[in-house]
């Protein structure tokens, strides 16, 4: 059997890692061993970050809805309960957008929620 030299594959593998490490400082960019560790850790952080992003945005939406609901005389939990009882099924993302960009529209929703809570 013929001898297989793996220089091409090794160079390709190294180049792939070093390309991913572009923008890092010092040895993390230049030395393959260190760059590989840095890239693996960065990918772990990126994976975790994608999960945290969902939590963070939901938290932000809830904070915005709560602030707008309190301006209209309701707490967040009572507002959401009123929305449920009124049969209004808008998700938190949309409600937060309405709260930020359309105060009058949110006030109308708050009144409907108050009415549903009173009934």
From Swiss-Prot:
**PANTHER family to which the protein is assigned, alphabetical:** 39S RIBOSOMAL PROTEIN L20
Function, please?
A: Binds directly to 23S ribosomal RNA and is necessary for the in vitro assembly process of the 50S ribosomal subunit. It is not involved in the protein synthesizing functions of that subunit.
Keywords noted in UniProt: Ribonucleoprotein, Ribosomal protein, RNA-binding, rRNA-binding
Q: What is this protein called?
A: Large ribosomal subunit protein bL20
| Keyword set includes S-adenosyl-L-methionine | no
Q: Name one GO biological process term.
A: translation
Question: What InterPro entries is this protein classified in?
Answer: Ribosomal_bL20, RIBOSOMAL_L20_CS, Ribosomal_protein_bL20_C
Q: Name one GO cellular component term.
A: ribosome
The GO terms describing molecular function are: rRNA binding; structural constituent of ribosome
Per the record, the similarity remark reads: Belongs to the bacterial ribosomal protein bL20 family.
Keyword Chaperone set for record:
no
Q: Which organism is it from?
A: Xanthomonas campestris pv. campestris (strain B100)
